[in-house]
Amino acid sequence: MAAADGDDSLYPIAVLIDELRNEDVQLRLNSIKKLSTIALALGVERTRSELLPFLTDTIYDEDEVLLALAEQLGTFTTLVGGPEYVHCLLPPLESLATVEETVVRDKAVESLRAISHEHSPSDLEAHFVPLVKRLAGGDWFTSRTSACGLFSVCYPRVSSAVKAELRQYFRNLCSDDTPMVRRAAASKLGEFAKVLELDNVKSEIIPMFSNLASDEQDSVRLLAVEACVNIAQLLPQEDLEALVMPTLRQAAEDKSWRVRYMVADKFTELQKAVGPEITKTDLVPAFQNLMKDCEAEVRAAASHKVKEFCENLSADCRENVIMTQILPCIKELVSDANQHVKSALASVIMGLSPILGKDNTIEHLLPLFLAQLKDECPEVRLNIISNLDCVNEVIGIRQLSQSLLPAIVELAEDAKWRVRLAIIEYMPLLAGQLGVEFFDEKLNSLCMAWLVDHVYAIREAATSNLKKLVEKFGKEWAHATIIPKVLAMSGDPNYLHRMTTLFCINVLSEVCGQDITTKHMLPTVLRMAGDPVANVRFNVAKSLQKIGPILDNSTLQSEVKPILEKLTQDQDVDVKYFAQEALTVLSLA
């Protein structure tokens, strides 16, 4: 920076002020991003006495600039002289925490939380707590909202008198007139509870929690559900029934589906927090109701949690609860009218197999899996197929294979290319589970069909799929079943299919090794150097470059080099370029 020039040490601040006042927002943004450089040049004293006051006074800019400023100030502790001066950063951050734009306020709060840890206890009480109080008592809801996120970081390190004040301020925010503030308080209630003493959690947090959980606004009530998880973790088991469960029961039956959705979404966390006894008496019936909820979003959220909820049930009653109380609800969800619900269930239902064991899986789950494999919604079928490994470990896949096949074939030919892509990605896994005979008989032709799909992404995925299959089944299998079919495509009238032969050879050569590549695949590549389409010819050059390292030197010299040299004389500029590149890379030039 120019400050290094000695006498003209005012230069950087002058530039900054100029650029900060420039009409071009990009220049202002750049100067804010260079703030640490400028602070370094000014030194800690002038940063404190000139730069920070200047920044505090000029907070009236574009949100983008303010966001950058809020972020920078969070890392400024050393630039103002270390922890004993860190309180100098509070005024500009306090201003930023009151602006209208939420993103800027959130970033300012994040920076304030970060620097709070660098305050000594006495500085917290002298500087940080007054800031929290000012924000919490501010006229605008924006400042009161920001205050909510600052209580938990300063509470643990202040005196008990100040702690009492902070609790009172937080209580006021929980009953603020503005829903936005109550929302912010509800969202921070859990983390504030974590730093409170247990007696205060019982005497003060619980009443706040109960009030927020019965707020008139559903957006506040649903945030109280999140806090419920944290609060339940803090309380001893014997207090849960009286202090938390009434509120949780009420939330699980709330008139707003968004609150019930939040209960379903947090269900397994709640389950862990309240423990096995309350789970058995309260949460199992609540879970049944959520799975039967009239709102599809809620049923889908509950469906997502089925496997985890069942896993977490205590071992002594797990099987009984699942078979008598959960499974009947699952059976209804399998034929739900909403495809998101069915898809959510299909993504986890296979996970019940290991929990219930072989006999129950065959008798009770298998019929459900088979029904889902025939579902009209591709996502449902796909989710079942992609989770087959759970079932395979318990009952072996043979039980499913007869129904699997039609489902796989339909997905493999689905009109949506993303569905086709997803099934290709599961093919190596399926192949490994079904075994080579089944694969050759039933699935091989599908894998070949994908190589000539009209969507490039499918052809590309199908090519790497071949490589994974060879890794599973071995190169002898590749030589006998895959390579002849791949090489046959080199004579296809469609040049895209001829190019696919080259792409396949590129990946197959890696797994098949020198012998098979030299004897069986190389001759086809060399022959294709005479293809009428330039795109094919330059891909021949690229293929030779790719497989060259696998071949031995005499083959490279006697067979590959002459062909590449011939291609360097091609009339097409791309063919020449790639042929020359291949010669250079293979050190044949």
Swiss-Prot record:
<dbReference type="GO" id="GO:0051898">
    <property type="term" value="P:negative regulation of phosphatidylinositol 3-kinase/protein kinase B signal transduction"/>
</dbReference>
<keyword id="KW-0007">Acetylation</keyword>
<dbReference type="InterPro" id="IPR021133">
    <property type="entry name" value="HEAT_type_2"/>
</dbReference>
<keyword id="KW-0966">Cell projection</keyword>
<dbReference type="GO" id="GO:0000775">
    <property type="term" value="C:chromosome, centromeric region"/>
</dbReference>
<comment type="similarity">
    <text>Belongs to the phosphatase 2A regulatory subunit A family.</text>
</comment>
<dbReference type="InterPro" id="IPR016024">
    <property type="entry name" value="ARM-type_fold"/>
</dbReference>
<dbReference type="GO" id="GO:0000785">
    <property type="term" value="C:chromatin"/>
</dbReference>
<protein>
    <recommendedName>
        <fullName>Serine/threonine-protein phosphatase 2A 65 kDa regulatory subunit A alpha isoform</fullName>
    </recommendedName>
</protein>
<dbReference type="Pfam" id="PF13646">
    <property type="entry name" value="HEAT_2"/>
</dbReference>
<dbReference type="GO" id="GO:0030425">
    <property type="term" value="C:dendrite"/>
</dbReference>
<dbReference type="InterPro" id="IPR051023">
    <property type="entry name" value="PP2A_Regulatory_Subunit_A"/>
</dbReference>
<dbReference type="GO" id="GO:0051232">
    <property type="term" value="P:meiotic spindle elongation"/>
</dbReference>
<dbReference type="GO" id="GO:1903538">
    <property type="term" value="P:regulation of meiotic cell cycle process involved in oocyte maturation"/>
</dbReference>
<keyword id="KW-1003">Cell membrane</keyword>
<feature type="repeat" description="HEAT 10">
    <location>
        <begin position="361"/>
        <end position="399"/>
    </location>
</feature>
<dbReference type="GO" id="GO:0160232">
    <property type="term" value="C:INTAC complex"/>
</dbReference>
<keyword id="KW-0472">Membrane</keyword>
<dbReference type="GO" id="GO:0051306">
    <property type="term" value="P:mitotic sister chromatid separation"/>
</dbReference>
<dbReference type="GO" id="GO:0090443">
    <property type="term" value="C:FAR/SIN/STRIPAK complex"/>
</dbReference>
<dbReference type="GO" id="GO:0004722">
    <property type="term" value="F:protein serine/threonine phosphatase activity"/>
</dbReference>
<feature type="repeat" description="HEAT 12">
    <location>
        <begin position="439"/>
        <end position="477"/>
    </location>
</feature>
<dbReference type="GO" id="GO:0035331">
    <property type="term" value="P:negative regulation of hippo signaling"/>
</dbReference>
<dbReference type="GO" id="GO:2001241">
    <property type="term" value="P:positive regulation of extrinsic apoptotic signaling pathway in absence of ligand"/>
</dbReference>
<feature type="repeat" description="HEAT 14">
    <location>
        <begin position="517"/>
        <end position="555"/>
    </location>
</feature>
<feature type="repeat" description="HEAT 2">
    <location>
        <begin position="47"/>
        <end position="84"/>
    </location>
</feature>
<feature type="repeat" description="HEAT 6">
    <location>
        <begin position="201"/>
        <end position="239"/>
    </location>
</feature>
<dbReference type="GO" id="GO:0160240">
    <property type="term" value="P:RNA polymerase II transcription initiation surveillance"/>
</dbReference>
<dbReference type="GO" id="GO:0098978">
    <property type="term" value="C:glutamatergic synapse"/>
</dbReference>
<dbReference type="GO" id="GO:0016328">
    <property type="term" value="C:lateral plasma membrane"/>
</dbReference>
<feature type="repeat" description="HEAT 9">
    <location>
        <begin position="322"/>
        <end position="360"/>
    </location>
</feature>
<feature type="repeat" description="HEAT 13">
    <location>
        <begin position="478"/>
        <end position="516"/>
    </location>
</feature>
<comment type="function">
    <text>The PR65 subunit of protein phosphatase 2A serves as a scaffolding molecule to coordinate the assembly of the catalytic subunit and a variable regulatory B subunit. Upon interaction with GNA12 promotes dephosphorylation of microtubule associated protein TAU/MAPT. Required for proper chromosome segregation and for centromeric localization of SGO1 in mitosis. Together with RACK1 adapter, mediates dephosphorylation of AKT1 at 'Ser-473', preventing AKT1 activation and AKT-mTOR signaling pathway. Dephosphorylation of AKT1 is essential for regulatory T-cells (Treg) homeostasis and stability.</text>
</comment>
<dbReference type="GO" id="GO:0007059">
    <property type="term" value="P:chromosome segregation"/>
</dbReference>
<dbReference type="GO" id="GO:0000159">
    <property type="term" value="C:protein phosphatase type 2A complex"/>
</dbReference>
<dbReference type="GO" id="GO:0007143">
    <property type="term" value="P:female meiotic nuclear division"/>
</dbReference>
<feature type="modified residue" description="N-acetylalanine">
    <location>
        <position position="2"/>
    </location>
</feature>
<keyword id="KW-0158">Chromosome</keyword>
<dbReference type="GO" id="GO:0043025">
    <property type="term" value="C:neuronal cell body"/>
</dbReference>
<dbReference type="InterPro" id="IPR011989">
    <property type="entry name" value="ARM-like"/>
</dbReference>
<feature type="repeat" description="HEAT 15">
    <location>
        <begin position="556"/>
        <end position="589"/>
    </location>
</feature>
<feature type="repeat" description="HEAT 3">
    <location>
        <begin position="85"/>
        <end position="123"/>
    </location>
</feature>
